[in-house]
Design a protein with these regions (language model features):
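Non-catalytic, charge-rich alpha-helical accessory subdomains
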Residues: 89, 94, 98-179
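Switch/coupling segment of Walker-type NTPase motor domains
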Residues: 1-103
Length: 179
């Protein structure tokens, strides 16, 4: 860092992407780079309030991109070497996630296309095991979508997810929230 990265960055002669896990490089030369006209951005996964953000929704161009995002998210959050005895839960959770991401991609304004909104939708999908007639705000959202566009791709995945019992749906939601 001291003899390679800092001297090269301080020459200010090109754009940089610097891995700085300790934050010492940005602390030591971030101000210099900003004074030279650089836009310094930090992705800090520990202190998110001090971090610039990454929103994968910005890069979703088509349905295949959505599928790939969900698949990669599940792969990235599965511990190495672990295998589920029953893949049903991961498959069902990915169907729910696909429904939510497709809904946001095609129906939400750009500022609501993000993972915090996915979590908000997930929380809106409250399931009551003792009341089969209960309709959650998320159910209402997809009911309205069905009235407007019964062939919507998000609706197809939501129907697949929603075909289980209340107890099963609750377990699927917990599986997804844990990811």
């Amino acid at each position: 860092t001291r003899f390679f990265c800092k001297p090269n960055a301080m020459q200010c002669n090109t754009s940089f992407v610097i891995l700085d896990p300790k934050g010492e490089i940005v602390r030591d030369i971030g101000g210099l780079l900003e004074n030279k006209g650089y836009e310094v951005r930090v992705l800090d996964l520990i202190n998110m309030h001090r971090s610039h953000c990454y929103n994968p929704f910005v890069y979703l161009r088509n349905d295949n991109d959505v599928q790939r995002l969900v698949t990669n998210l599940f792969k990235a959050t599965t511990p190495k070497g672990s295998q589920s005895q029953d893949p049903f839960w991961d498959t069902a959770a990915s169907m729910l996630l696909l429904a939510l991401v497709f809904y946001l991609k095609y129906e939400a304004p750009p500022d609501e296309q993000n993972f915090p909104m996915v979590m908000e939708l997930l929380r809106a999908g409250e399931v009551r095991e003792d009341d089969d007639s209960y309709v959650s705000p998320l159910d209402e959202l997809f009911d309205r979508l069905e009235m407007v566009n019964p062939e919507h791709i998000a609706l197809k995945y939501y129907r697949d997810y929603h075909s289980g019992s209340a107890k099963t749906l609750k377990s699927i939601q917990i599986t997804l929230a844990a990811r």
